[in-house]
Amino acid sequence: AMIEGSGVQGILLTGGNSLCKYGGEAKERDQVEKYLLEWSMKKDLPVLGVCRGMQLVQDFFGNELNPVDGHVGARHELSIVEGRHLSDVLTKLASVNSYHEYGTKVVSGELAACAHSLDGVAMAVEHVSRRVYGVMWHSERESPFVKEEQEVFNYIFK
C-alpha cells in the first residue's frame, strides 16, 4: 500500500544473505521482496534481481536452487545464450565476479537463462514475457567500475 502512488519506475532486488528457504533468516525481507516482484509485474515495471535478488526471482518462478562450489569470491567468464533480450549487452562483459553459495543449472518455466558460468551455473536470467531479469554478479563490487555493466542497467531500466 505504501508503494502505490510513490512514483516508483522500477525495482532493484539487491544482494544479501540467503533466502529463508535456503538457510537465511530474513523472513520479512523475503515476503516484502516477493510482494514487490508481484506488484511490479502487475504494473509492468522493470525488475532486476542481483545475486540474492536473482535467487528470489528464480525461487518465485519455481526454479530450485542448489549449493554450488567455486562461486564465492571468484570470477567467471560468461557463456551467453543467443537470442535473449540481454544477450547483446552481456557479450560485452569479459568476466564477472561471484559471491553466491546457491545457484541452479536448470532454468525452466517462465524464466530463461541468458548466460551461464563455464561450469554451467545460470548467471543471468530473464522472464520470457515480462520485464523481470536477474544477474548473479555484483557490479557495485567492481573496482574500478566496469562501464559495460552499466549497459545492463541501462537496458533494463530504459
Q: For each predicted feature, which ranges?
A:
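A conserved active-site-flanking secondary-structure segment within enzyme catalytic domains
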Residues: E25-E38, Q58-V96
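Proline-centered loop/turn at the N-terminus of a beta-strand
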Residues: P46-L48, E64, A112, R131
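Flexible gly/pro-rich beta->alpha loop and the following alpha-helix that scaffold active-site loops
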Residues: A1-L48, F61, N154-F157
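Flexible loop residues that form catalytic
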Residues: G16, R130, E140
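Acyltransferase
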Residues: W137-K158
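Active-site glycine-centered loops adjacent to acidic/histidine catalytic or metal-binding residues
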Residues: C51, H100, H138
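Gly/Ala-rich beta-loop-alpha elbow adjacent to hydrolase catalytic centers
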Residues: G49, G53, Q58
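Catalytic beta-strand/loop cores that center a nucleophilic Ser/Cys/Thr
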Residues: R84, D88-S129
